[in-house]
């Protein structure tokens, strides 16, 4: 099992992520992991790896506004790309406004904007050409692909090429507008990336990477500038007077490519600056131009470094922090987020620069807000069958003492390691506004039959008939008469103490009989037999009539909704009175057919075999009416009728198959145990290879002794069966711990007071089969009283072992063996450890002796017996002896060795003994009524006339339960 799991911390090292991120993903996937040392199943690894294998290509820059107009920039590592290097050439002074956009933002004051431009490895003059931007946000343009012909514009400080004229711009104006809109609509999602940035102090050199700008957008802008107002033309003239700067290669982008913030990534994957970036260290200067129009231009390029792009809050796209490192987000600098106010809209890419700049107020855009409203999710905690207080506090983000305080208010004494069941956890979580969600492995998905049975696949099966009734009414004898065997002769005391399952072939067909015990201690066995049966045959003795267990059997059959047939047995006895039996049956609701009812009643005699054939015919008729069918071609399902631990073969269980066919080698799950069928035996002890519906078989191959009555289900996968069994064992353990640890103040106080007074009888019980053990434990628990409490230290099926003796020795217990015997070595260990072993084969003898042992634990009861009294009529003071009371015995007698009380006006003045009792001068042992005597009391002389001396004695009696 160890190889099937992996620890959280080992998986985190393997995936290269932090344990905190891994635990977060596990919670999202609803995989139970409470700490870094928790184990994760190998089956869950693929979906965990799928969460971390998705490459994060959105490592971009994050923008924050520290002060009005001041931007915080941080860098994150970006994957290296195979894109071609960008060549920079000198630019002519006549170059008009460009729509170059960048992803790098620097920390700059709004009033003193000082952009920089990166320098290439070639020597570039330090002159700049001032460029104004009308765009609201930075446009992202990717590299062109070979499918689109590139038109390169290269300008030098002293010459300008004429191939980019106004005519070229006009020709490409219409097509470029369409292409830009199409490209923008295709890449709306990709442009809304999360930029990442690294903080750079104000005034320092800011290395920047300028993405290439498409030629068609530049031509559009040239056309706009020619049609603009005279104020714009004056600005262009002012631009030409300034020395030229350098511009990147401008080419037409591929229409199908997306505008990505990290399209032009020239940094290495390690995040180090390149030599080209390090060379950019030009001093900034401010813009001396006046801005006119209704709206001031939000973005401008100033100074000799064009790559330093200053964005006002209007131009900042949405910045999300979901993927950011917490340590990077919370810097020591004061930062203000403005992404909730200024939102980046991808549809602005479809609008011309004219509508984004000075004339933006003239055209209203119907842009939609890209951010979605945050949905309020209910706060939930995940609980399986139970949860510890510490784990619950961890999930709720509280301290454990807060939960303990709530539990104290609910009357529950709690500790930090106490397990809470799901009901208590729900109450506590509601106090803090949380909901409890029950999670865990759901076995119902694999065990519950989903598809209904097809009528063609159903075949007839033998009926399961359970014989029930009062003890000694002849149930097993009747079954022996049907089977022509002698089971009764082999039973201790002639009573049945196990459930017997037998397959019988009769003239009327095959019938499966279940013989249940009739003793009152085997109530659970009878209830279990009624649940798995088709017909109940109620056996009533003709001489005894309806008894207590007869009524109980009727109630079990009615609760299981099973038809009842009555067999009046012992008709051969001369004192048989069947009419009285029928009358008593009518009183409990079983009206015979002869009396106008619907209960089938037949008169039989197991001893003389009278009425047996008639009973079998009635059973066959009832079977035809019920139309019992089952599908033999599906995996087997059934119930455990009886289970035991065999010394040579291990755990063995009697299974009654209800549907399907059980084959040798099948994998099954039963209760908290799983296993594989190693061998199967029928009711006659013969080995069989398979068993169909309604067949009782003995199955060998359990991992442990299952509980009688558990469901037996075959599964196709052994691993699944083991997992279901482990899940059930964990749930059962959590339920037991939660039940034991749930102590209220009332139960705690009552328990402590009872423990001081009550005696405890510790027992270790071993039985031959699981069903008998269940009955014995239930009968012993009923014997507990307020004075003596029975404590079952251990109960199990199988032979008495040395470990049982050592356990009994450590806990001062008595070992009870029911139908089991110890070996010579075990007896020797018991003698050494002074452990008492008691053996029984009849359950009521066991119960009687345990009662006697319980009574022996009680201390004897002291009882006071009144003997008589004497009236004081004279007082004599004798030197050296004291006061002597001359008394007359008015009632009963006064004994010399008895105790006495001195009563004065009805008040007890003295209680003690008699020092001397004399009649005349002789010492006497007793004085009868009507005689006079002299009485002196021990150590007491204050006797007065008129006092009454009462005589009594104390008698000890054995305590009773």
From Swiss-Prot:
Stretches for region G2: 494-498
Binding residue positions for GTP: 469-476, 515-519, 569-572
PROSITE patterns: G_TR_2 (PS51722), IF2 (PS01176)
Region spans: G5: 605-607
Segments of this protein annotated with the region G3: 515-518
Source organism superkingdom: Bacteria
InterPro entries given in the database record: EF-G-like_DII, IF2_II, IF2_N, P-loop_NTPase, Small_GTP-bd, T_Tr_GTP-bd_dom, TF_IF2_bacterial-like, TIF_IF2
Compartments, as annotated in UniProt: Cytoplasm
Region (Disordered): 146-373
tr-type G domain mapped to chain residues: 460-627
Chain positions covered by the region annotation G4: 569-572
Stretch list, region G1: 469-476
Annotated Basic residues bias: 355-364
Low complexity: compositionally biased ranges: 177-187
Composition bias type Basic and acidic residues, residue spans: 163-176, 230-239
Entries under NCBIfam families matching the protein: IF-2, small_GTP
The protein's role, per its UniProt record: One of the essential components for the initiation of protein synthesis. Protects formylmethionyl-tRNA from spontaneous hydrolysis and promotes its binding to the 30S ribosomal subunits. Also involved in the hydrolysis of GTP during the formation of the 70S ribosomal complex.
The protein, known as: Translation initiation factor IF-2
Naturally occurring in which organism (per UniProt): Lawsonia intracellularis (strain PHE/MN1-00)
Gene transcribed to yield this protein: infB
């Amino acid at each position: 099992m160890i190889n099937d799991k992996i620890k959280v911390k080992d998986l985190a090292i393997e995936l290269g992520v932090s344990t905190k991120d891994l635990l977060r993903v596990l919670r999202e996937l609803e995989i139970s992991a409470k700490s870094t040392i928790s184990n994760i199943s190998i089956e869950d690894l693929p979906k965990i790896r799928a969460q971390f294998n998705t490459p994060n290509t959105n490592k971009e820059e994050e923008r924050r506004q520290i002060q009005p107009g001041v931007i915080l920039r941080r860098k994150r590592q970006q994957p290296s790309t195979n894109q071609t290097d960008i060549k920079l050439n000198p630019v002519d002074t006549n170059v008009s406004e460009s729509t170059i956009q960048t992803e790098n933002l620097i920390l700059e004051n709004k009033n003193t904007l000082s952009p920089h431009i990166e320098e290439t490895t070639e020597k570039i003059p330090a002159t700049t050409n001032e460029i104004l931007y009308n765009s609201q946000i930075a446009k992202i343009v990717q590299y062109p692909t070979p499918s689109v012909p590139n038109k390169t514009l290269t300008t030098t400080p002293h010459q300008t090429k004429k191939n980019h004229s106004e005519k070229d711009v006009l020709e490409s104006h219409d097509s470029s507008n369409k292409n830009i809109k199409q490209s923008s609509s295709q890449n709306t999602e990709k442009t809304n990336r999360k930029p990442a940035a690294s903080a750079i102090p104000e005034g320092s050199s800011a290395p920047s990477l300028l993405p290439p700008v498409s030629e068609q957008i530049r031509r559009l802008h040239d056309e706009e500038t020619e049609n603009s107002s005279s104020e714009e033309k004056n600005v262009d003239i002012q631009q030409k007077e300034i020395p030229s700067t350098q511009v990147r290669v401008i080419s037409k982008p591929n229409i199908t490519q997306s505008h990505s913030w990290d399209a032009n990534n020239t940094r290495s994957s390690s995040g180090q600056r390149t030599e080209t970036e390090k060379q950019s260290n030009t001093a900034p200067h401010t813009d001396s131009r006046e801005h006119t129009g209704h709206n001031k231009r939000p973005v401008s390029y100033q100074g000799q470094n064009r790559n330093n792009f200053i964005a006002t809050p209007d131009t900042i796209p949405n910045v999300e922090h979901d993927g950011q490192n917490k340590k990077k987000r919370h810097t020591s600098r004061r930062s203000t987020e403005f992404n909730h106010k200024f939102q980046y809209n991808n549809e602005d890419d479809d609008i011309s620069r004219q509508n984004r700049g000075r004339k933006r107020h003239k055209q209203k855009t119907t842009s939609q807000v890209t951010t979605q409203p945050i949905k309020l999710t209910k706060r939930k905690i995940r609980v399986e069958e139970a949860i510890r207080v510490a784990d619950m506090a961890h999930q709720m983000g509280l301290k454990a003492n807060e939960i303990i305080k709530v539990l104290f208010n609910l009357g529950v004494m709690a500790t930090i390691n106490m397990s809470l069941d799901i009901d208590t956890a729900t109450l506590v979580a509601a106090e803090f506004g949380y909901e409890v969600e029950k999670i865990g492995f759901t076995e119902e998905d694999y065990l519950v039959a989903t598809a209904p049975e097809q009528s063609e696949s159903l075949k007839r099966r033998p009926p399961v008939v359970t014989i029930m009734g009062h003890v000694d009414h002849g149930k097993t004898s009747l079954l022996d008469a049907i089977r022509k065997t002698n089971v009764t002769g082999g039973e201790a005391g002639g009573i049945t103490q196990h459930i017997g399952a037998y397959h019988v072939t009769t003239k009327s067909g095959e019938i499966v009989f279940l013989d249940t015990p009739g003793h009152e201690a085997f109530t659970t066995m009878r209830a279990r037999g009624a649940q798995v049966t088709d017909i109940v045959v109620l056996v009533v003795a003709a001489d005894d009539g309806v008894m207590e267990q007869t009524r109980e059997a009727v109630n079990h059959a009615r609760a299981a909704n099973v038809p009842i047939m009555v067999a009046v047995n012992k008709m051969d006895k001369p004192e048989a009175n069947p009419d009285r039996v029928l009358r008593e049956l009518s009183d409990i609701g079983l009206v015979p057919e002869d009396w106008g009812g619907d209960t089938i009643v037949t008169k039989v005699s197991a001893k003389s075999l009278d009425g047996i054939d008639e009973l079998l015919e009635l059973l066959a008729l009832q079977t035809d009416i019920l139309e019992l069918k089952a599908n033999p071609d599906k995996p087997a399902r059934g119930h455990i009728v009886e289970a035991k631990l065999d010394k040579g073969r291990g755990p063995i269980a009697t299974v009654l198959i209800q549907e399907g066919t059980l084959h040798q080698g099948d994998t099954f799950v039963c209760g908290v145990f799983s296993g594989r069928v190693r061998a199967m035996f029928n009711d006659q002890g013969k080995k069989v290879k398979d068993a169909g519906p309604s067949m009782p078989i003995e199955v060998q191959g359990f991992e442990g002794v299952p509980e009688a009555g558990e469901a037996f289900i075959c599964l196709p996968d052994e691993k699944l069966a083991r997992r279901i069994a482990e899940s059930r064992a964990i749930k059962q353990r959590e339920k037991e711990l939660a039940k034991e640890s749930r102590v209220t103040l009332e139960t705690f106080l009552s328990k402590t007071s009872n423990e001081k007074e009550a005696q405890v009888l510790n027992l270790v019980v071993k039985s031959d089969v699981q069903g008998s053990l269940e009955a014995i434990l239930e009968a012993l628990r009923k014997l507990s009283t307020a004075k003596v409490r029975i404590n079952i230290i251990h109960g199990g099926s199988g032979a008495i072992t040395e470990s049982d003796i050592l356990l009994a020795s450590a806990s001062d217990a008595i070992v009870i063996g029911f139908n089991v015997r110890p070996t010579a070595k075990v007896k020797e260990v018991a003698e050494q450890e002074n452990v008492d072993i008691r053996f029984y084969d009849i359950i009521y003898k066991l119960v009687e002796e345990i009662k006697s042992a319980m009574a022996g634990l009680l201390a004897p009861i002291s009882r006071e017996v009144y003997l008589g009294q004497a009236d004081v009529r004279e007082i004599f003071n004798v030197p050296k002896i004291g006061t002597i009371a001359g008394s007359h015995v008015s009632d009963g007698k006064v004994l010399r060795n008895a105790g006495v009380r001195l009563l004065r006006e009805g008040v007890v003045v003295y209680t003690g003994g008699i020092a001397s009792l004399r009649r005349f001068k002789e010492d006497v042992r007793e004085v009868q009524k009507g005689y006079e005597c002299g009485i002196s009391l021990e150590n007491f002389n204050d006797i007065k006339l008129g006092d009454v001396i009462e005589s009594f004695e104390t008698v000890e009696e054995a305590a009773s339960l």
